[in-house]
Swiss-Prot record:
Top-rank taxon, per record: Eukaryota
Key words, A-Z: Chloroplast, Membrane, Plastid, Thylakoid, Transmembrane, Transmembrane helix
Pfam families associated with the record: PsbN
Location in or out of the cell: Plastid, Chloroplast thylakoid membrane
Protein name in the entry: Protein PsbN
GO cellular component, one term: chloroplast thylakoid membrane
Encoding gene, per UniProt annotation: psbN
Disulfide bonds: none
Length: 44
């Protein structure tokens, strides 16, 4: 368990997981109220 590859893999896993959780929070959480919708702005 002292292998550098193990710690690097663990770091990458936590990094990707945190980016995924942050993206979901931005997309669906309270900050999503400030996001603009280009389809609603477009008039036909």
């Amino acid at each position: 368990m002292e292998s550098p590859a193990f710690f690097f893999t663990l770091f990458l896993w936590f990094f990707l997981l945190s980016i995924t959780i942050y993206s979901i929070y931005i997309g669906f959480g309270p900050p999503s109220k400030r996001l603009r919708d280009p389809f609603e702005e477009h008039e036909d």
